[in-house]
From Swiss-Prot:
Keywords: Cytoplasm, Methyltransferase, rRNA processing, S-adenosyl-L-methionine, Transferase. It holds the Pfam family SPOUT_MTase. Its main location: cytoplasm. One of its GO terms (cellular component) is cytoplasm. GO terms for molecular function: rRNA (pseudouridine-N3-)-methyltransferase activity. The gene is rlmH. Belongs to the RNA methyltransferase RlmH family. It is found in: Cytoplasm. Its EC number is 2.1.1.177. This is Ribosomal RNA large subunit methyltransferase H. InterPro entries: Alpha/beta_knot_MTases, RlmH-like, tRNA_m1G_MTases_N. Homodimer. The keyword GTP-binding does not apply. It comes from Clostridium novyi (strain NT).
């Protein structure tokens, strides 16, 4: 299975890069992982709603440029469906059984995802009602994908 993580914003913190590297290495025995980092648009402190909408649309266009037609798109969205680790494992497993071998998981920038990206998404996933920094969300997402593969393989993993 090919999994592409499309994320807005570059990782600057070394500890987050180390965590990403570790989970990428662990996932390499289960899937082909590709992480696409896109430059975020600068948001002025006094940005109006219109300014924020334009920024989300620009970031959304960059995201959609990396989404191939055959990809099953899972957008991380505060208003998406919450799922347990087991439910995420089931979703990933079912996609593989249905021949959906290209999955894109999308993490927006600090303003979230554009309407266009959300409309393209096949599934909207929420990890919590809380808001997380999008850089940290990348680590959390990779850990949950790794956990899903361990669950599907029937392998033990620390709970």
């Amino acid at each position: 299975m090919n999994i592409t993580i499309i994320c807005v914003g570059k990782l600057k913190e070394k500890y987050l890069k180390l965590a990403i590297d570790e989970y990428s290495k662990r996932l390499s025995r289960y899937c082909k992982l590709n992480i696409v980092e896109l430059n975020d648009e600068k948001t002025p402190d006094n940005a109006s709603e219109k300014d924020e909408l334009i920024i989300k649309q620009k970031e959304g266009s960059k995201i959609l440029a990396h989404v191939k037609e055959n990809m099953y798109v899972i957008a991380l969205d505060l208003n998406g469906k919450m799922a347990s680790s087991e439910e995420l494992a089931e979703l990933i497993g079912d996609l593989g059984l249905k021949g959906k071998s290209n999955i894109a998981l999308v993490i927006g920038g600090s303003l979230g995802l554009s309407k266009e990206v959300l409309n393209r998404a096949n599934y909207k996933l929420s990890f919590s009602k809380m808001t997380f920094p999008h850089q940290l969300m990348r680590v959390i997402l990779l850990e949950q994908i790794y956990r899903a593969y361990k669950i599907n393989a029937g392998e033990p993993y620390h709970k």
